[in-house]
Structure formats: C-alpha cells, structure tokens
C-alpha cells in the first residue's frame, strides 16, 4: 500500500477515527469485535493481529482465548455478546445483520457507540480482504499469539505462514 501514499493517508485517517482510545466503546472490545469479524471473513492474518493487539492493550488473556465461545462464556457481558453477534453477522457475505440485532444493540449501546462498533466491523471488512488477497507473511508476535491462543481452537496461519 505504501506505493500509493494517498491510499495510506486515507486509511490512517479512517483507522485513527475508529481506533480512538477515548472512544465510547472500550478499545479492547473493539479489537475483539474486529477479531470475530475477521474470523467470520476467514482472514487468519487479521485474526492473529487482532488477538495480539488485544493482548498488548490489556484484554484478559482468558477472554482472548474464549472469544470464539463468547455467546456462552461467563467472561462476556450481555452487551458485549450483542455487539459480537452483530460483528459476526455484519462480516458475513452476504451481510446477515438484522433489524432485531440492531434493536438488541440499542438496548445496551447508544447511537455513537453503535457507529463505533459498525466502524470496526467495516474497517476490518477492508483489511480482511486486503490481507487475505495479498497474503503477507505473519510477523513473529502475531504468529506466536495465534499459535498460543487461537491454534487450540483450529486457527492456522494458512497462506500467511512465514
């Protein structure tokens, strides 16, 4: 992407608007939203990166390891489950988000928070396609995180193997 500076600049602006640390949605939750969206899209590269970023920013390692079981894990609140459900549905092709899901979102999240949640899902729609199409090799830290926390649940680096 560095070959297209305007593209990089636009992406950085979009990323910083979504990943603001002082947003209304917990930064760690946004990373887990991006993670389950990436899993739905099948992008092992982004799954490893979002798990590593979540770990790096202080998300409990047990929660990262349990994220694929968020619907039943006691580590997740109902509000988090509702947001993660929308992430799975919103990342599906075709999109599977429903009016009922958004009604549930509104029970726990205000409009600004919902925009942050959907922004994270949409941003990773782009990043999943970019990284899965170009198939970059995984860097050491995300690869190690993937192997430690995600591989026990079936994750592999796939075409992103170093």
Tell where the protein language model's regions lie, with residue ranges.
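Hydrophobic alpha-helical segments
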Residues: 1-162
């Amino acid at each position: 992407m560095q070959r297209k500076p305007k593209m990089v600049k636009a992406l950085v602006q979009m990323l910083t608007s979504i990943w603001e640390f002082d947003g209304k949605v917990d930064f760690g939750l946004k990373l887990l939203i991006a993670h389950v969206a990436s899993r739905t899209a099948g992008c092992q590269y982004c799954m490893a990166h979002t798990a590593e970023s979540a770990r790096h920013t202080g998300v409990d390692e047990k929660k990262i390891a349990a994220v694929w079981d968020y619907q039943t894990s006691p580590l997740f609140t109902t509000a988090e489950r509702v947001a993660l459900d929308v992430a799975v549905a919103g990342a599906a092709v075709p999109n599977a988000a429903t009016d009922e899901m958004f009604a549930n979102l509104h029970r726990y999240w205000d409009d600004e928070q919902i925009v942050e949640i959907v922004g994270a899902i949409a941003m990773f729609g782009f990043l999943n396609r970019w990284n899965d199409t170009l198939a970059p090799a995984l860097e050491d830290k995300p690869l190690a995180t993937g192997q430690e926390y995600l591989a026990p649940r079936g994750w592999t680096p796939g075409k992103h193997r170093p």
